[in-house]
Structure formats: C-alpha cells, structure tokens
Curated annotation (Swiss-Prot):
CDD domains membership: QueC-like
Residues the entry annotates as binding Zn(2+): C213, C226, C229, C232
Protein name, UniProt field: 7-cyano-7-deazaguanine synthase
Metal-binding in keyword set: yes
HAMAP family documented for this protein: QueC
Top-level taxonomy: Bacteria, Pseudomonadati, Planctomycetota, Planctomycetia, Pirellulales
Family under the similarity heading: Belongs to the QueC family.
Length: 250
C-alpha cells in the first residue's frame, strides 16, 4: 500500500537545509525515534520516502501514528509493507502467549537481550528499505536504531549497521557499479532518549502523534500506552529529563 502525500507547506525545507540532498528512504514505525529520524532527514534536505511494516506486531496502532507523522511532516510517499513475522514467533511483540516485561522504574530494565527482541527484524526491514532505495534511485537510508537505550538488541549495534552497509554495497546493482553508492544513516545511534526528544522538539516533531509502547491498550487508532514496558519507561525518562510532559499522555 502506498499513499502519495502532497503538502506544499510541510514539504518546504527548513532553514538549516542548504540544498536538495536527493531521495532518502526512512523507516517509520510510528514511534518517537523514527518520527525524529524523518524530521532529521528532511532538515538535511532529503526528499523523504517513508516505509512502515505491518508484521503482526501486537502494537499495530503504531501504524496509525506512522500515517499521521507521514502526513504531518509532508513525506513524498509512504509505503506500508505487509510481512507476517507472527508466523515465526519468538518474540513478545508478535506472540501474545509471551508476556511483555513490565516494571515500575527504568533502572529495573534487564541488561540482557529481552523477549521483545524480534528475530532478525532490522535485517529484514533494512533489506526491504534497500530494495525500495534501489528502485527509487536513492543512495540514502535512515533508521532510528539506538545503541544506548536498547543495548540489549543485537541489531541496534553499530557493528550490525556497518556490516549491513558492506553487504548492501556487495549485493546490489548500485553497489557493484559504485561501491560508495549507499549510506545507512543512524543519527540517533549514540543519543540518549532525552537528546532525541530535544532534537525532535527543535525540528517541530509532534510527539503527541507517536506510540512507543510495546503493549498498548485499546483499538488501533486509540491505543494508550501501558506505562510499564521498557519502551514506555525509557520514553518517560526522556521527557522527564527535558522537564516537559509527554504530549501523548493526557
């Protein structure tokens, strides 16, 4: 599914974008990090083509937020790609029989690989992004992975991103013809959640229209965060450190 969004006001480049940087494919989940990534790509002058995934996630209300962010930020196109990772299982995010870990404080988040890790998810998502980028003639992919807040996820590490970029340059027509043809941008990789939020606010991201929760309650378009999963706790910590209220919680 693809929607082309036309909004001359929201598509205007920010003052800091000095020139048209070309097309960029941005992974947009509907969460806080990916929305910030879209804003950063636009601020750098890229023509943003967003992609989202309906992969059997229990928090599929994030896709409603992704559509809203795509519209608010004036992306040129927004694709929603269907992949049924629930067939494979192995994660609390796609298997309702596995409980999402809950806690009352961010310091209690476990340091090992959590059950919310979806096997090979970022490898799969980036592979689709790579195919879309090559089809569009784009040299740039943005993904909002973060190695500080999500250190337990193996596919959020800089080593993984570097390895995938090397693979992409070997496995594509564009890469064979120009070994430096593709760059995977990870602008949030070494930022704290507070720093991500601060930058997003500077760029005008509407965080009221984002959903970070792994186990939200309610219908898809009205899902409310649980407030106790790892994602909720880290998000709350980020807003608290900025001394502002989370606009998504009212």
């Amino acid at each position: 599914m693809e929607r082309r969004l036309v909004n001359s006001t929201s598509q205007s480049k920010t003052e800091s974008a000095q020139q048209d940087a070309g097309k960029a494919v941005v992974l947009l989940s509907g969460g806080l990090d990916s929305a910030t990534c879209v804003a950063i790509a636009r601020d750098q002058g890229f023509e943003v083509h967003a992609i989202s995934f309906r992969y059997g996630q229990r928090h599929d209300g994030e896709l409603d937020r992704a559509a809203k962010q795509a519209s608010l930020m004036g992306v040129v196109s927004h694709r929603v790609i269907d992949i049924d990772l629930a067939q494979l299982g192995g994660s609390a995010l796609v298997d309702s029989s596995i409980a999402v870990p809950k806690s009352d404080h961010v310091d209690k988040i476990a340091g090992d690989i959590p059950v919310t890790y979806v096997p090979a998810r970022n490898t799969i998502f980036l592979s689709y992004a790579l195919a879309v980028a090559e089809t569009l003639g784009s040299r740039d992919i943005f993904i909002g992975v973060n190695a500080l807040d999500y250190s337990g996820y193996p596919d959020c590490r800089p080593e993984f991103i570097d390895a995938f970029q090397t693979m992409a340059r070997l496995a594509t027509k564009a890469g064979v013809e120009d070994e430096h043809s593709l760059t995977i941008h990870t602008p949030l990789l070494h930022w704290t959640k507070a720093e991500i939020i601060q930058r997003g606010i500077e760029l005008g991201v509407d965080y009221s229209q984002t959903l970070s929760c792994y186990d939200p309650q309610g219908s898809s378009d009205e899902m409310r965060p649980c407030g106790q999963c790892d994602a909720c706790l880290l998000r709350a910590k980020g807003f608290a450190e900025n001394e502002i209220a989370d606009p998504a919680i009212g």
